Amino acid sequence: MKRTPHLLAIQSHVVFGHAGNSAAVFPMQRIGVNAWPLNTVQFSNHTQYGQWAGEVLAPAQIPALVEGISNIGELGHCDAVLSGYLGSAEQGRAILAGVERIKAVNPKALYLCDPVMGHPEKGCIVPPEVSEFLLDEAAATADILCPNQLELDSFCGRRAQSLEDCVNMARSLLQRGPQVVLVKHLAYPGRAEEQFEMLLVTAEHSWHLRRPLLAFPRQPVGVGDLTSGLFLARVLLGDSWVQAFEFTAAAVHEVLLETQACASYELQLVRAQDRIAHPRVRFEAQLLAL
């Protein structure tokens, strides 16, 4: 019997709706990966509603929970760590210590960092010290880095002006330590407005992928969290980087189609679960000669 992969997912949780672990854990489990959720915050709902209740997990709880898993002899079974929204820079440093602890018992374990830096215009608020931590510390530890365009620009200290510029900026991030950079959403000047574009860059190759951009009255939250989780899960299931890239784009598109059909602000993960596992659509990533 083929072994089921395990990963530790350390990011936010919302009681209502889908963001952070609430967007990523179920889809990862649905496609065959045993996700262990460790929630950095527990909020009533995501912050783009403009009001919420809840609290941030005390940073000391992260190593305590990792230690608890170690004490029952299960930490060595962890194949990867995924981190996303952080409530504080202290949480981030606790996560890096956890990654180090896991890699000590499983050197093959991967660390995917989704460097959520916030988007104040959309109501996504991240403390300034978190962005500084991500820029200065997390990128050097990550095996897989999954920024969006805003975060890519922040890492590189300038705004991308073209697709080629995005590729070069992603390559510059590889020099900090990651094996691969997945840019979840490209937003460079001159791109096709009716297309949603993504980029995957390794030391050897770069791939560009387009899918239709679906219209919503309000853009659903949690798409990036879903993207990072599915990509890491497919890698753990044996996909190559580009296979995981293509699968993720298709599965996320299926979720968005169902969400659009339901006229919902929240991702329709349960309704779309079979399409997540077996997408009906396929988008081919184009190898770039750049």
UniProtKB/Swiss-Prot annotation:
Species this protein is from: Pseudomonas putida (strain ATCC 700007 / DSM 6899 / JCM 31910 / BCRC 17059 / LMG 24140 / F1)
Key word Cell membrane present: no
Residues that hold substrate according to the record: 12, 47-48, 225
Domain of life: Bacteria
Similarity remark: Belongs to the pyridoxine kinase family. PdxY subfamily.
Designated name of the protein: Pyridoxal kinase PdxY
Reaction equations catalysed: pyridoxal + ATP = pyridoxal 5'-phosphate + ADP + H(+)
Single Gene Ontology BP annotation: pyridoxal 5'-phosphate salvage
GO terms of molecular function: ATP binding; magnesium ion binding; pyridoxal kinase activity
PANTHER family: PYRIDOXAL KINASE
Residues the entry annotates as binding ATP: 114, 151, 184, 211-214
One Pfam family per UniProt: Phos_pyr_kin
Annotated pathway: Cofactor metabolism; pyridoxal 5'-phosphate salvage; pyridoxal 5'-phosphate from pyridoxal: step 1/1
Biological role: Pyridoxal kinase involved in the salvage pathway of pyridoxal 5'-phosphate (PLP). Catalyzes the phosphorylation of pyridoxal to PLP.
HAMAP family documented for this protein: PdxY
Gene: pdxY
GO CC, any one term: cytosol
Cofactor(s) needed for function: Mg(2+)
Quaternary state and interactors: Homodimer.
Keywords: ATP-binding, Kinase, Magnesium, Nucleotide-binding, Transferase
Magnesium in keyword set: yes
Listed EC numbers: 2.7.1.35
